[in-house]
């Protein structure tokens, strides 16, 4: 009996950290890799690469823990989230907060092996990770905070590798903010009806009937910024082919969200993993 209860608790913790749903970690991992490869001119330091890769999965898990704590009074009313560990009672509020602190401390321990500039920047990253889940209570722009939180590994990566924050670093950071608004708006379109009932704010609600148009404009802006980044650091032709393929993926996403059907909007969200991968491959092979 005790063993069964322990296993059940462990599985609940795994669900809280979304170990069974790696898409969020991957959407955080790709921009981190973009930055490390660009900052390292195609040859990232192995120690730095390992620290950031581990940090991505740890901080994503920490972000899920604090997000579910912030949403604990709302998730029970949303079809997609009502079986999560907190609303279902499998994990207590105290346990979720302890998990967040433990994961954040382990992540900070890894950061301490980097240079001082990266260490100082990590404090901003932690603040953004904590802030995001609560922004949706009073603002329609939580996706912008998510973009900043998910993209903060970009300036941290440049700082860790080169101890500098060049123009391409901040352009790439802006690219990631646009991308985060794109995919998290698609994600929020899945829950829009439930969110309207319970008062949760999102860009999907703010954009209303212009949601598809604004997503399309952000996709175009993202591609134009990526062209500028490639020009600034002299990336090769294969990088621009990856941008063309990314544009094709964006067109496919527009087709998926055309009817605003829940399942298809979620598929559009998931498709962004391929966007991140294609862009990384374009950067990677430009340095080969």
UniProtKB/Swiss-Prot annotation:
The chain crosses the membrane at residues 23-43, 46-66, 98-118, 119-139, 141-161, 163-183, 213-233, 238-258, 268-288. Keywords: Cell inner membrane, Cell membrane, Magnesium, Membrane, Transferase, Transmembrane, Transmembrane helix, Ubiquinone biosynthesis. Coiled coil: none annotated. It catalyses: all-trans-octaprenyl diphosphate + 4-hydroxybenzoate = 4-hydroxy-3-(all-trans-octaprenyl)benzoate + diphosphate. Its cofactor is Mg(2+). It comes from the Bacteria. The keyword Protein transport does not apply. One of its GO terms (cellular component) is plasma membrane. Its main location: membrane. Its EC number is 2.5.1.39. Pfam families: UbiA. InterPro entries: HB_polyprenyltransferase-like, Prenyltransferase, UbiA_prenyltransferase, UbiA_prenylTrfase_CS, UbiA_sf. It is an enzyme of class 2 (transferase). It is found in: Cell inner membrane. It is a multi-pass membrane protein. Pathway: Cofactor biosynthesis; ubiquinone biosynthesis. Belongs to the UbiA prenyltransferase family. Catalyzes the prenylation of para-hydroxybenzoate (PHB) with an all-trans polyprenyl group. Mediates the second step in the final reaction sequence of ubiquinone-8 (UQ-8) biosynthesis, which is the condensation of the polyisoprenoid side chain with PHB, generating the first membrane-bound Q intermediate 3-octaprenyl-4-hydroxybenzoate. This is 4-hydroxybenzoate octaprenyltransferase. The gene is ubiA.
